Amino acid sequence: YITPVNSLEKHSWYHGPVSRNAAEYLLSSGINGSFLVRESESSPGQRSISLRYEGRVYHYRINTASDGKLYVSSESRFNTLAELVHHHSTVADGLITTLHYPAPKRNKPTIYGVSPNYDKWEMERTDITMKHKLGGGQYGEVYEGVWKKYSLTVAVKTLKEDTMEVEEFLKEAAVMKEIKHPNLVQLLGVCTREPPFYIITEFMTYGNLLDYLRECNRQEVSAVVLLYMATQISSAMEYLEKKNFIHRDLAARNCLVGENHLVKVADFGLSRLMTGDTYTAHAGAKFPIKWTAPESLAYNKFSIKSDVWAFGVLLWEIATYGMSPYPGIDLSQVYELLEKDYRMERPEGCPEKVYELMRACWQWNPSDRPSFAEIHQAFETMFQESSISDEVEKELGKRGTRGGAGSMLQAPELPTKTRTCRRAAEQKASPPSLTPKLLRRQVTASPSSGLSHKKEATKGSASGMGTPATAEPAPPSNKVGLSKASSEEMRVRRHKHSSESPGRDKGRLAKLKPAPPPPPACTGKAGKPAQSPSQEAGEAGGPTKTKCTSLAMDAVNTDPTKAGPPGEGLRKPVPPSVPKPQSTAKPPGTPTSPVSTPSTAPAPSPLAGDQQPSSAAFIPLISTRVSLRKTRQPPERIASGTITKGVVLDSTEALCLAISRNSEQMASHSAVLEAGKNLYTFCVSYVDSIQQMRNKFAFREAINKLESNLRELQICPATASSGPAATQDFSKLLSSVKEISDIVRR
């Protein structure tokens, strides 16, 4: 008689007699959903499931019913243990989570040195103790762990079982095995013999660069520190350039920060080894639109030059302490605007040399962009010059002396200071109702305007557009010629701008501008970017679809090649008083001084509509640009000290009441707009009172949504006041009001 082998032993999840403590030890190297089934040592014949979730191990007794069936939850009973495990691997049904990954058995033989596929990077997952989850990655989750052998804290990237991206995950590991540089995150090992797959890398103390920039102490992370960070990233990318790798997802969210402002490039999920000049992504591949070069959006073509474009956007993120690129612009509009020669403006306080480098990275033709070797050399040159912080301090101090705001402008921090005095002076010639969003659209209507006003912002500086020649090593001779021609062209634009009408100026500049390479068919242009919004999730509060409506209307109706004053088609439908509070609709508890102040300053309003002088369209662009750290300050801005949390909350309630009364046909559409304008003005004044930086970001985004919704209601009052469209429009407005209220209450 031969005793039959216990059929349970063939299952990877069955561990036989194992104590509770031993089960917890075996699961210490697992992740959410790691489990085992064991026989109780203290109670022979009794079995339990041990399941790990969020750093804890949960134990569930497997019960036997009177009819011999097995169950954990009495509602679901099974004939065999295998059936029970299979059921709970698809639905939790009483467990903390579903059963995903069987824990490795203690006596599993090693195959090191025996397998023909032996890999020196492969390590036993039992060598790693998993701790808490740090966040999500390209294909799975990232955990903090400890490498037991060395008591070393590590980061462990895992693959989500349901992503079916095993091949892509293993490609990332393959890339990391080939690279080693002080500013690239170092691979320590992999576990790829069985799921769950692990990539183990060094642990970076301060997490990703995007969150670090948004939450850092700006006295400590000064202009020089920001420059040092950019230098390190350019060094890492120069190394990848030499090794013929492309990253394809270069952004602040994919860089990590360690001690002493050490920065390393990470997240190689989209990286590829180049075998030719370009890499063509497969159809349906998703990319972060705002960081992706035009040729990549249009044709799915990637090269090291498309990484250079992304580096320019990353520089802009650094210079703005983590602002989301193209603020207020919908994803579907980005490619169209870039094609019309729109580029993001120079962040406040950003040195001209650094901005010129950004603009060089954003050349439409990939061949016109600098190499990473040139970029790195340019940063090394700038960093060795102590004048970089002096330049920032000088620019900020210069603005401070214009109107006695020097006390706000002392520290040499890049984008955190506002151009208060400059705004006050320039607002005399510009209508208060022109919002940053509208001004950006005027840039699309006249590509030259974006360049002209940048010149005005840096007037008196000796650098100008010729700065890249000194800020970075000279590129090949044809590039130098192009740079000089570009510099001459800019001088021509600047002088023509002051002496000619915008309509004529625009026509001439259109002739000067070299034609970009032919983009794809119209459907491809608009379609490509719109397909890939998913990776925008890495942004903090990116623009919402709400903003798309008015922007799309204006973009369609505006042809930059037509004669006439730029932005004419845009100004007509935009009434002049969106941000202006109305004294007739005071929310309860509102102090008298904030309301009376704006209502006594109506002087600029006649110029805000169709009668605005055409030349004034160019003047306020630099002063009213959107800044992450400061909202624009129209002349009627109320002193922030007079606007309290209660005032804002009362104003939100007043707007909700006006909407409710309008729905019941007890109040007019204009009453809703009036209450909305009051709320907008109070919010703009209140934003600087918010201490927590993350809340401040969210609040600014909410203000932008509110402004966009008010504009839509104001442009289309007939639609908004009748039929089912009213509910939809007011629901958008109510959503932004609720968002504002929630943030203020935090």
From Swiss-Prot:
Species in which this protein is naturally found: Abelson murine leukemia virus
Note: This protein is synthesized as a Gag-Abl polyprotein.
PROSITE patterns (alphabetical): PROTEIN_KINASE_ATP, PROTEIN_KINASE_DOM, PROTEIN_KINASE_TYR, SH2
Domain of life of the organism encoding this protein: Viruses
Catalytic activity: L-tyrosyl-[protein] + ATP = O-phospho-L-tyrosyl-[protein] + ADP + H(+)
Residues holding ATP: 134-142, 157, 202-208
GO function terms (MF aspect): ATP binding; non-membrane spanning protein tyrosine kinase activity
Domain SH2, first and last residues per copy: 13-103
Short name of one Pfam family: F_actin_bind
Keyword field: ATP-binding, Kinase, Nucleotide-binding, Oncogene, SH2 domain, Transferase, Tyrosine-protein kinase
Family that this chain belongs to: Belongs to the protein kinase superfamily. Tyr protein kinase family. ABL subfamily.
Signal peptide: none
Motif (Kinase activation loop): 267-291
Compositionally biased spans, kind Basic and acidic residues: 498-508
Region called Disordered, residue ranges: 389-613
Residues the record marks as active site: D249 (proton acceptor)
Ranges of residues in domain Protein kinase: 128-379
Top-level EC class as recorded in UniProt: transferase
Keyword flag Nucleotide-binding: yes
Compositionally skewed regions (Low complexity) per UniProt: 592-602
EC code(s) of this entry: 2.7.10.2
Keyword tRNA-binding among UniProt keywords: no
This protein's name: Tyrosine-protein kinase transforming protein Abl
